[in-house]
Amino acid sequence: MTLEADKQTHGFQTEVKQLLQLMIHSLYSNKEIFLRELISNAADAADKLRFEALSAPALLEEDPNLRIRVEFDKQAHTITIDDNGIGMSRDEAIAHLGTIAKSGTADFLKTLSGDQRKDANLIGQFGVGFYSAFIVADHVDVYSRRAGLTAAEGVHWSSKGEGNFEVATIDKPQRGTRVVLHLKENEQHFAEGWTLRSTLKKYSDHIGLPIEMVKEEHHGKEEEKDAPKEAEWEAVNKASALWTRPKNDIKDEEYQEFYKHISHDMTNPLAWSHNKVEGKLEYTSLLYVPTRAPFDLYHRNAAKGLKLYVQRVFIMDQAEQFLPLYLRFIKGVVDSADLSLNVSREILQSGPVVDSMKAALSKRALDMLEKLAKDAPEDYKTFWKNFGQVLKEGPAEDYSNREKVASLLRFASTYDTSGDPSVALADYIARMKEGQDKLYYLTGESYAQIKDSPYLEVFRKKGIEVLLLVDRIDEWLMNYLHEFDGKSFVDIARGDLDLGNLDSEADKKAQEEIAKTKEALASRIKATLGEDVAEVRVSHRLTDSPAVLAIGEGDLGLQMRQLLEASGQKVPETKPVFEFNPSHPLIEKLDAEQDMDRFADLSHILFDQAALAAGDSLKDPANYVRRLNKLLLELSA
């Protein structure tokens, strides 16, 4: 492997340069994670070889027993990780070790603050794989040959992490990849047998193939110690796939480390569910709920889905057919005994086996979230902060689990003045007033914008709780979530508000009588506002404000209009209903006004104020200001 040909120097991709600088100057408290990352890469390489060898057994050459070997040299201050997995060609080494193809990289780099300790945590969230070698090494050599290529087509990749790397063609008889770390002066303590063994046990005990180190002999006689002896390798891990072991034999720490292995996320998961199904279908699943959202959660082409194994043989990453899109944040493994080893993504698109597994895994994931919400409410708050908007896609996508998904949703409400989205629908129902049979809600841009909205006035007066829906997809969500626990949802800004049994018969009769006495005023206002409004009527929503704009029953609300505008779609024109409070002093003054110009100015001012109170923008702000200034001048005269 010493003869090199066709040596070239390449520059790292810009994002890699930035990551390398962070690695080189890293303030990681647990620098030993470099070993976990490199072992994880080696295990992935073995999985890929197993899969490709299903259709091309010759790729195994004469070395079918896959393993990872870890060596160290105290004198040379090196650590070597050697695998006999799939290996890399020259082009693959340049592509895989010189660039980052992971979506969301640019977003990730933008979040870096320059504070090295904070950035170290962010790097851990992102997962840097191979580049973590530079946490402890100032020079890294990689020797590799892809399975199926000749011995003369090996590649040597070398870098000091200083902006460029060298590649050369070498002879490499053995298939696979050998990574040699030349340790920094202050990191040479890692080149110790006990340190490496304990680190491997801590982070990589779950890896499903042997991780071997040279057996360390403890001799009692000097002559035995001096006698030359061929190295004897021994496995330092359990070397069995974690999900195949009985649940009772697996420690929490092992579950956590396995999650980090499959997700490349350095934070512990919030929850996990390990389940073996036997009977008509046979499969094992191990599902995890992450603590943090990945940077590419909202990227349409981002990697998602479970790792798929068939009878313990790795088939593919990101098998997205086993969970609906709204559960795309779930990480994990599914190992089936009912799918064939030559299964493809196309075959997975449909079929009774996949459909049945998808339904069961979806239910298991939702059960896991339900248990998290019940047993660890603070952890569920963390989950909701990171993944709540994604879960809100569920009622539209998964009709069969609509009620279950709805029970997991959280909203702000008038019950909790903190504005935190902490109210479950079941909690709301438990607090409903006697005679209340509807779930009332209001949508808006933010909690601050709607917490004192005029739409809430009658509900505050009667002590009725209202859900405050302030995520940008909430109005869209409510198009699919019509009821919960047999009770209908009502948008309090929409249509002619009917409080049902919450209003007494006397109240309803009084409202009808007042509306009749104000019919003439309603007609005058409608004639003045003209095409700006669909209707003018007396309001039953208001106690303190003079007027409010109600949304027509079939019309789009502000959130939906903004969503459509943002996506470049045509927004249908809608006209609000102008409702006025007959007992408000301004309305009484308006009713008594005989000067038509002043009546028109005041009517338009009230209309524009109602639009602003609803969170909308004014079509003609200049005219609003002109009218308001004119009125103020008259009042101050």
From Swiss-Prot:
Keywords: ATP-binding, Chaperone, Cytoplasm, Nucleotide-binding, Stress response. PROSITE patterns: HSP90 (PS00298). It is found in: Cytoplasm. Transmembrane segments: none annotated. One of its GO terms (molecular function) is unfolded protein binding. Residues 1-345 are annotated as: A. Residues 346-562 are annotated as: B. Residues 563-637 are annotated as: C. It comes from Xylella fastidiosa (strain 9a5c). Molecular chaperone. Has ATPase activity. The gene is htpG. This is Chaperone protein HtpG. InterPro entries: HATPase_C_sf, Heat_shock_protein_90_CS, HSP90_C, Hsp90_fam, Hsp90_N, Ribosomal_Su5_D2-typ_SF. Pfam families: HATPase_c_3 (PF13589), HSP90 (PF00183). HAMAP family: HSP90. One of its GO terms (cellular component) is cytoplasm. Homodimer. Belongs to the heat shock protein 90 family. The keyword DNA repair does not apply.
